[in-house]
Amino acid sequence: KIDGSGVDFKFGAIVRPFEDSPFRIGVSVHTPTFYNLKIKTNVRAVTYTPDFDSKKLSEAVVDSYDFTNGVDYGYDFRFRTPWKYNLSLGYTYGSSFAIGAEYEYQDYSAMHFSYSDGEAMGWQNPTAKEMLKGVNTFRIGAEWKVIPQFAFRLGYNYMSAAFKKTAFKDLSYNSINTDTDFANAKANNNYTLGIGYRGSTFYADLAYMYSTYKEDFYPFDDGALKKTDVTNSRSKVMMTLGLRF
């Protein structure tokens, strides 16, 4: 269990470079989120040993409480997310058509872990740099109002992979995790199609989203082990209904 809180700041601006044109340029910078967190965990190991004389199983229980004076094992730490940079372009034609595009960059290898006294963690930070990389995100969308109350929408979103090809699950010798499998997700593509209605008191939106991405699956870490290619696809339909008073 992890509890805590964090704070970040966002700065941005929108510029219209041409006075008589609806074309606009937007830029924004999101600072890292600075988290102060506390982790609590406990472990229980139960072992059954056959007793052939009594034909029964003897049970042995080892509980982490036995080593931590009856309390959860835990510690305080700090976590800092990467900076995020965004550039957007937008254009409207009259009151019936609008199109916009965005580019976003965030380097996940720059995330940082430290103890409550500020000392950098010696395992988590090098592992993040070794396994993760910068992510490029592109978004583009358009809306066409057939009539003032009814609109068609179309969108596309591309997000590059956050994991390097050589990434693996680096379980420490004292890890409480029992799962060894892992999958390195590749680029993600999202396609959306929607319609919307805006009345004086009632509004409705209906959207369909199709997402697909590939990943390399490994049951455990072994340099000689061949990957399994997996393709993930998902379809989603979303509807919003509302009333204005």
Where are these regions (language model features)?
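Outer-membrane beta-barrel porins/channels
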Residues: 1-245
